[in-house]
Structures are given as structure tokens and as C-alpha cells.
């Protein structure tokens, strides 16, 4: 979902963050701090997120602002896709989460699948790199790139009650459960089915 006001607020936040990192003039630093506060209030309003939550999100952000990276594992078994039930909202998503410092994207996919679903997987190939704002997600304070990695199931067993998840299942594309649209949309799940079944090696890029 592309909302101009929210996009503009994110750009203002990025400019102010860079200015606070590299600026030297005291008056300019005050102006950058004011811009940062304005951007936080704008993002809170347009994303319907509490101001304190948005401020907390950016409290540790310094230097040149860059998009966050969300990594999702795409795992098929008998033409059904692995989904986990999110404890946060009770809806379902592909196993995954934010990229971790020190880990490769493939390592994150393996780690998140084990932690959230209980299964051991082997990364096979990259399916897609999508820009979250170009898809029908709820508004978000963050600019996010989403990486989808096809993985082969090699072991483990379902984890029914994890730290962040409360259920695990394999679902046919015509029988999907309620999805956690903050994390993945129905269109994206359908797209992952198509890309995973394809013999072509082309990666889908926004």
C-alpha cells in the first residue's frame, strides 16, 4: 500500500537521521532534531502506531538510514506450504523475521524456520526480493525489503508452542488460513507457490 504522506514522513526521518549523524553546526542539529520529531508524529498518525512506539523504533537508529530487511523461508511438502501461527496476532505467515547481524540471508531462513516451526531446512534458491510498500500490507513506519528463499525440508518436527508462534501447518494454496498481512499477503503466498514450482531460475524483483 503506497501512501504518499507516510512515504514523505519516512524520507524526512531519513534526512534528519543523516543530518544528526554528519552535521556539525549546532543550529542545524537542532533543526534536524525538530524534523525528526515531526517525522515521528507523522509516521505515528499515518501508520496508526503510538508515538512512543515509533520513537522507540528509531531511538537506536543512527547514521545513514537504510531499509530494514525481512527474510521469509518458503518450504513445500506435497504441494503444501509451511506456515506458522504468529503469537502476536493469531494469524499465519511464512516462517521468518528481521535479518540478523552476522548471519547471511540463507542462515537467517534456516534459523527462523527452526525457531518458529521446529523444522530443519536447506536453502535452495532465491525466489523474490520485494519492496513492502509496493504490496497490500498495512501502513508501517519502516521501509522494508522482503527476501523470499525457497528451502528444502530435511528434518525436525513441528513446534506447536514456540516463543513467537503457537502453531505450525502445511496448507494448500486453495485452503489458506487467516494470514498475518503485516508479514505476508495472500497474493505473495500465491506468488511463492508459482515461483517455487517453476523450473526457471529467474528471481522476481520490485
Question: Where are each of the predicted segments found?
Answer:
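Nudix hydrolase/Nudix homology domain
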Residues: 1-32, 91, 158, 163-206
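Long alpha-helical scaffolds
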Residues: 9, 16, 36-39, 117
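Acidic, metal-coordinating catalytic segment for phosphate/diphosphate chemistry
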Residues: 27-29, 33-72
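N-terminal strand-loop-strand
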Residues: 55-94, 121, 125
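Unchanged
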Residues: 99-122, 131-188, 192, 204-206
Amino acid at each position: 500500500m503506497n501512501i504518499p504522506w507516510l512515504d514523505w514522513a519516512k524520507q524526512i526521518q531519513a534526512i534528519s537521521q543523516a543530518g544528526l549523524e554528519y552535521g556539525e553546526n549546532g543550529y542545524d542539529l537542532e533543526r534536524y532534531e525538530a524534523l525528526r520529531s515531526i517525522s515521528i508524529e507523522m509516521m505515528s498518525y499515518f501508520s496508526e502506531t503510538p508515538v512512543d512506539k515509533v520513537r522507540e523504533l528509531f531511538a537506536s537508529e543512527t547514521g545513514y538510514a537504510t531499509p530494514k530487511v525481512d527474510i521469509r523461508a518458503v518450504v513445500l511438502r506435497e504441494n503444501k506450504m509451511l506456515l506458522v501461527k504468529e503469537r502476536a496476532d493469531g494469524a499465519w505467515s511464512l516462517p521468518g523475521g528481521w535479518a540478523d547481524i552476522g548471519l547471511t540471508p540463507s542462515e537467517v531462513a534456516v534459523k527462523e524456520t527452526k525457531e518458529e516451526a521446529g523444522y530443519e531446512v536447506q536453502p535452495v534458491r532465491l525466489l523474490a526480493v520485494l519492496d513492502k510498500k509496493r504490496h497490500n500490507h498495512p501502513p508501517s513506519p519502516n521501509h522494508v525489503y522482503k527476501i523470499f528463499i525457497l528451502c528444502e525440508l530435511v528434518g525436525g518436527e513441528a513446534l506447536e508452542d514456540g516463543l513467537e508462534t503457537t502453531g505450525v501447518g502445511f496448507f494448500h494454496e486453495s485452503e489458506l488460513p487467516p494470514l498475518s498481512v503485516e508479514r505476508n499477503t495472500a497474493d505473495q503466498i500465491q506468488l511463492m507457490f508459482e515461483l517455487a514450482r517453476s523450473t526457471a531460475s529467474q528471481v522476481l524483483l520490485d
